[in-house]
Amino acid sequence: MVDPTFEPDNVAVKNQMREKYDSVGRSFLSNYKGRSRQAAEGMILSHGQPGLYWMEHKIDTAFAMGRFSRADRLLEVGCTAGHYTMKLVRDGYQVVGLDISAESIRAAQVLAQDLGLHTEFIAADVEDMRGVPDNSFDGAFSFSTLRYVPDPVSSLSEIRRVLKPGGRAVVDFPNKYCPWFEFLKFLMGGERHIHDHTYSTGQVKRMMQQAGFVNIHAKRIIFFSKGMPGSLTPLFKATDFVFERTPGMNYFAGIIMCKGEKLGA
């Protein structure tokens, strides 16, 4: 069972994560090189039908919890090659993408430029965003990122620092009680991501509190892997709709989505 016991050498952990996603960024650019603008559009949504459902369900849930609007300046923490950032910018939101991997950021910049999307991407460590001024954003969100960092509380504290007073952050973590993360994933041939950790809802809320957030609220969503057959996506969506709203059953959902606010001035 994976638990949030973090490796003592945080620098080594970060270097490994940076190297992993630098490789992802280089691979992305290599696959993209020479393709058309139409291909670039497709790469934003290159997740297949289940993956696109995951993307949209996470966005819809997070933006409802954070009450984010198109008038808000938003920060995406852990944007990798910018798929979520660019989808949202294309939909009229003001989003800045941030990632520890300079190569992933470079890939995001190339794709955004080719698509004519005007936004900013920053290569920075979420635990030390010293280049990002205090009180810069109305909101922040992070998907499938803080589960890998050596010190989630420091990361959450930095996210809180760059929010304006009254700003909201919505982050997600894998639910430690979901059977997928504990054994089903590996029975189906999935690989364990380096430095991955799972959490309970109580642990996530406590980390948000320790980072200084108030008005904390969490909900559990999604019961299926985005790697499932696309033909079953309508069934997954219907099942999620029911199970997420069923007490007891939602205890085993895959994702814990948690919202916190920065106390106003």
What are these regions (language model features)?
Residues 196-211:
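Short alpha-helix
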Residues 175-195:
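Short, glycine-/aromatic-enriched active-site segment of Class I SAM-dependent methyltransferases
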Residues 2-68, 87:
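Conserved class I S-adenosyl-L-methionine
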Residues 183-189, 206, 216-265:
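A C-terminal cap/extension of S-adenosyl-L-methionine-dependent methyltransferases
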Residues 127-139:
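A short acidic, Gly/Pro-enriched loop at the edge of an enzyme's catalytic core
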Residues 153-165:
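A short glycine-rich, Lys/Arg-flanked "PGG" loop and its adjoining helix->strand segment in the class I
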